[in-house]
Regions:
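Switch/communication elements of ASCE P-loop NTPase nucleotide-binding domains
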Residues: 1-27, 210-214, 221
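Conserved helicase/translocase motor-coupling segment
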Residues: 33-133
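Residue-level recognition of short, structured coil/turn motifs
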Residues: 61-66, 152, 187, 206
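Terminal low-complexity/disordered tails
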Residues: 180-221
Length: 221
C-alpha cells in the first residue's frame, strides 16, 4: 500500500512540479533563445509584435534559427531595464532558455559610435549583450545586395550609379533618413509605407548572402 502525504509548500517543491508538468511542453511553447531588441514595445492585436526591428529579425532568422524569438523592448534605457527583469524571471522557470540583449550601434544617444566603441562596450558588459556592427537595421536592409535582389524579383530597375553616389559607407552612414531616396533608386514611383517597405526587404535576406552572415555574426556568436 502507498500512503499519500501532503506536499510541503516550498519553492523547490513547486519548481519540481512545473519541471515535471512542463518538461516536454515547455520545449514546444518556449523558444530556446529570446533576443530583446530596440523598438516599439506595445503589442498589437492578439499580442502580435509591432516593433520593426523585431519583425525584421524574425523574418530573416525564422528558418535558420527557428528556436529564437526576437522581441521589441522599447528604447535603449528600457531595453536594459526590461531585459534584466526578464533574465531574472526566466532563468528561474526555464533553465535552458538563453536571453540576449541586442542594440543598434547608435546606442550613444546620437553621438558617433565607432567599431572600437562597440568592442569596448561588449568587453565591459555581460556576455549576453550584443551590438550591431552596422549603424542600425536600415544599414542591412539598404545593402546593395538586398536592394538588387528585391528589384530583380519585382521587375524594377535598380539605379546602381545613384546608389553609389548616395551610399558611401554602408556600415556607418545614417540611412534611415534617406528611405525616400532609396525608394527612388529602386524605381518605385508610387507612394509606399516606409515600414512595410523595410519589412518586405527583410524577406530577401537569405543565408547565402554576405549581409546575412554579417548580421548573424553579431547575434549568434
Amino acid at each position: 500500500a502507498c500512503t499519500l502525504t501532503p506536499m510541503k509548500t516550498s519553492k523547490a517543491a513547486w519548481k519540481d512540479i512545473f519541471e515535471i508538468a512542463l518538461d516536454d511542453l515547455a520545449s514546444l511553447v518556449c523558444p530556446r533563445r529570446i533576443v530583446y531588441c530596440e523598438g516599439r514595445d506595445a503589442p498589437g492585436a492578439g499580442g502580435s509584435e509591432k516593433g520593426l526591428d523585431a519583425q525584421v529579425f524574425n523574418n530573416i532568422f525564422s528558418d535558420s534559427f527557428h528556436d529564437t524569438l526576437f522581441v521589441s523592448s522599447g528604447g535603449n534605457t528600457e531595453l536594459d531595464q526590461r531585459s534584466d527583469i526578464a533574465i531574472a524571471i526566466f532563468s528561474k522557470i526555464f533553465s535552458e532558455l538563453e536571453v540576449l540583449v541586442l542594440k543598434d550601434r547608435d546606442m550613444a544617444s546620437g553621438r558617433n559610435t565607432t567599431e572600437q566603441d562597440r568592442v569596448l562596450y561588449l568587453q565591459n558588459n555581460a556576455d549576453y549583450h550584443r551590438v550591431l556592427k552596422r549603424w542600425e537595421i536600415e544599414n542591412y536592409l539598404y545593402d546593395k545586395e538586398v536592394l538588387t535582389k528585391y528589384c530583380e524579383d519585382k521587375g524594377l530597375v535598380f539605379n546602381e550609379e545613384s546608389y553609389d553616389e548616395l551610399v558611401n559607407d554602408i556600415e556607418n552612414q545614417n540611412l534611415k533618413d534617406v528611405t525616400s531616396r532609396i525608394k527612388s533608386i529602386c524605381g518605385i514611383t508610387s507612394s509606399i509605407n516606409p515600414e512595410r517597405f523595410k519589412l518586405n526587404l527583410s524577406e530577401y535576406i537569405t543565408e547565402d548572402m554576405a549581409v546575412y552572415n554579417d548580421l548573424a555574426s553579431c547575434i549568434f556568436r
